[in-house]
Amino acid sequence: MKFIGAVYLLFLLPALSFNSSYEGLEKKLKEVFTERTGILRHLSKTSKELDSIKGNLQSLKNEDAVPKKDVQRILELSHKQRDEMKSLQAALQKQLDDAAERAEKQQATIKFLKMEMEKKTKIIKDLQQENKSLKNKLLSGNKLCDIHAEESKKIQAQLKELRYGKKDLIFKGQQLMDLENKLKVAKDELEKAALDKESQLKALKDTVHICFSSVLHSQTASLHRFPATPTNLLRYSALVNNSRVTFQQPHMKDIPKVPRITTTSKLPVSSAVMRRESTGPKDCQMVKVGSDCSHNQTESSSVMKKTFGHSQSKTPEQNGQGQARTAEESVKTDGELKKTQSDKHN
C-alpha cells in the first residue's frame, strides 16, 4: 500500500502548480528521492525474501518433504510476483524519469528565473542610480532655476531702470529740442540785432561824413573870404588832416551779441546829428576869424572821435544804453561848443 501511495504521489506531481516557491519544489523533490530510495530498499528486501524462498524450495526438493504441486504453485506465484515487480519497476522508472525531466526543467526555469532576477536586480540598481542622478539633476536644476529667477528679477529691475532712464532721456531730449529752438530764436534775434547795429553804424558814418563835408564846404567858403596866409593854410591843412576819420567795417565775430535794441534809441542819435549838422556851419558863418572856427571844428571833431571810440569800446551789454548816452552827450557837447563860441565872440 505504501508503494501504491508513492506511485499516486508521483502521478500527482504534474498537477502541482508552478506558482509555488522554489524552496517548496526542492523539498518535494527531496521527498520523491527519499520515497524512491525506500521503494528500492523494499524491492531489495523482497528479492532477498524470494532468494530465501528459492533456497527453501530447493531444501524442500532435497528433503522431498514438500509435494511438487505446492512447489509449482509457489514458483508460479513467484513468477507472477516477479512480473508484477518488473512492471512496477518499469512504471517507477518511467515516473522517476519524468520526475527527473521535470526537475531538470524546473531547475532550468529556476536558473532562468535567477538570471532574470539578477538582470532585474541590475536593472533596479541602474534605475536607482538613474533616480539618484535625476534627483541630483533636479536639485541642480532647482538651484539653476533659483539662480535664473534671481537673474530674471535683476534683469527686470534693470529693465525698469532702463525704462525710467529712457523716459528721462526722452524728457531731456525734449528739453534739448526746446533749448535748440530757443537758441535758434535767440540766434535769429542776435542776427537781427547785429543787422540793426550795422545799420546804426552806417547811419553814424553817413552823419559824420555829412558833418565833415558841411564843415569842409564852410571852410572853403571862408578861404575865399580871407587871404591865404601861410599860418591859415597850415591851420586848414591840419583841420583837413584831422577831419578825416577812418572807419573799419566790423567783422561778424567782433559784433557783440546783445538783445534786440528798440528803434527809440535811433531817434536821439539822428536828431543829435542833425543838430550838429545845423549848428556847425552856422557857428562857422557867425565867427569872423577863420582860425577860431577851425579851432572850434577841430575840437568838435576830437570830441566826436572820443565819443565814437568810447561807444565802440564798450561792452556788448552796455551798447544798447551807450547809444542813448551818446545822444545825450552829443547834445551836451553841442551846447558846450555854442557856449565857447559865444564867449569868444564876447
Swiss-Prot record:
**Where mainly found?**
secreted
User: Which chain positions lie within coiled-coil regions?
Assistant: 41-209
Biased composition range(s): Basic and acidic residues: 326-346
* Location in or out of the cell: Secreted
Where on this protein are sugars attached?
19, 131, 241, 296
Quick one: where's region Disordered?
Answer: 271-346
Cellular compartments per GO CC: extracellular region
Listed as disulfide-bonded, the cysteine pairs are: none
Positions of the region Leucine-zipper? 162-190
Q: Which UniProt keywords apply?
A: Coiled coil, Glycoprotein, Secreted, Signal
Feature: compositional bias, Polar residues: 293-324
Question: InterPro entries in the record, alphabetically?
Answer: Luzp2 (IPR026718)
Task: List the signal peptide residues.
Answer: 1-17
Which PANTHER family does this entry report, sorted A to Z? LEUCINE ZIPPER PROTEIN 2
Name-wise, this protein is: Leucine zipper protein 2
Which gene is this protein's source?
luzp2
